[in-house]
Amino acid sequence: MLDPILLRKDLQTVVDRLKSRGVDFDIARFNELESRRKAVQTETESQQARRNALAKQIGQLKGKGAPEAEVQAVMAESQALPARLKALEDELAQTQAQLNDLLMSVPNLPHASVPQGASSDENVEVRRWLPGAADERGIPAALGFEVRDHVAVGEPLGLDFDLAARLSGARFSFMRGQMARLHRALAQFMLDLQTGTHGYTECYTPYIVNSSTLFGTGQLPKFKDDMFFVTKGGGDDEPKVDEQGNPLAREDQYLISTSEITLTSVVRETIVAGADLPLRLTAHTPCFRSEAGSGGRDTRGMIRQHQFDKVEMVQIAHPEHSYEALEEMVGHAERVLQLLELPYRVMLLCTGDMGFGSAKTYDLEVWLPAQDTWREISSVSNCETFQARRMQARFRNAQNKPEYVHTLNGSGLAVGRALVAVLENCQQADGSVRVPAVLQPYMGGLTVLEP
């Protein structure tokens, strides 16, 4: 969520920066709600002051033995104030809730270093890394035989989309034997690298979260249609009550679309000691996405799935050091690809292509020879205080005062897409797949996967 103080002090700058993201901020609605909030708050404070003054006046009148009629007149005014104050407080809470709803739908402001642009066509390539020779286009040289896509390569090795479709429908995969082992090896390697070399603490997190958690990290309310909602069976439909028998509100639950949600929420509604920053957390989890709006795209294979695995990296950083942390995290994701000997490039996203909560994002794109193109395999973002403000995540600064942390997240990596990249880049003319050296210890010493 954006800083309300910034909106009040420098609204036009905020509007201009949002416009660079293709977002038109509703100035009229904001001004209407803000004016109402100020008026109601001023009136509330005035009535509270009047209540206190009347209480003092009643004491003084009684103390000096004023006539009963005079005392009763002041008491009558005092007794009428609670109802008026309750109405004002309710109106203030309602207005503040409407303001919060408005701000919850507004994306983060782009950092000054983010290039202006309307779409992915205007993203900027920062660098690329190739493990071998390049052709005249600056991409990996041809393999020297007819390239097959990961579906054709993977099916003889245990990748089964037909069975997955019978079990669950479209956009799911079933793996057995060598393929399942390679998928597991990739995840284990990524976790070991992030924990053993890069200093992240491994976490095991829930796969189901409450809606309030998703509001904190920014998935709700904007991306509700992209989430899988959890429907409980058994007796959970019975209404819950508190100790007095009053019905309790039932909070919706969802499957996580990324473990960024659970890892970042570790600091929700907490104040971290400044000396403990940065926190580096990682987890390997399945991720669940409805892929609303992506019908017809990437329907073949594992590129766009309803369920996929990912090793996530999260850092909770001091505001003064968060952009150093961002570059560090990009390097951590790059190292995975380098050790797997997979060609990739780093792209700085333009203002129009960034995610909702991001102030600055780098995408890592891996080369897929069968598609003759680069495909995203990791996205690393600095959200600054955007998530922290929503979830009230703070640290104590040098003056021992609470201040919002900066939150960063990134894939280290998407396991399924890494599997796709290995199958396509490491395929051999006879249909076998060369196992990258770094994965061989996780594969029992296997150097080649053969149909």
UniProtKB/Swiss-Prot annotation:
Pfam families: Seryl_tRNA_N, tRNA-synt_2b. SUPFAM superfamilies: Class II aaRS and biotin synthetases, tRNA-binding arm. It comes from the Bacteria. It is an enzyme of class 6 (ligase). GO terms for cellular component: cytoplasm. It is found in: Cytoplasm. Catalyzes the attachment of serine to tRNA(Ser). Is also able to aminoacylate tRNA(Sec) with serine, to form the misacylated tRNA L-seryl-tRNA(Sec), which will be further converted into selenocysteinyl-tRNA(Sec). Consists of two distinct domains, a catalytic core and a N-terminal extension that is involved in tRNA binding. This is Serine--tRNA ligase. The lineage of its organism: Bacteria, Pseudomonadati, Pseudomonadota, Betaproteobacteria, Burkholderiales. The gene is serS.
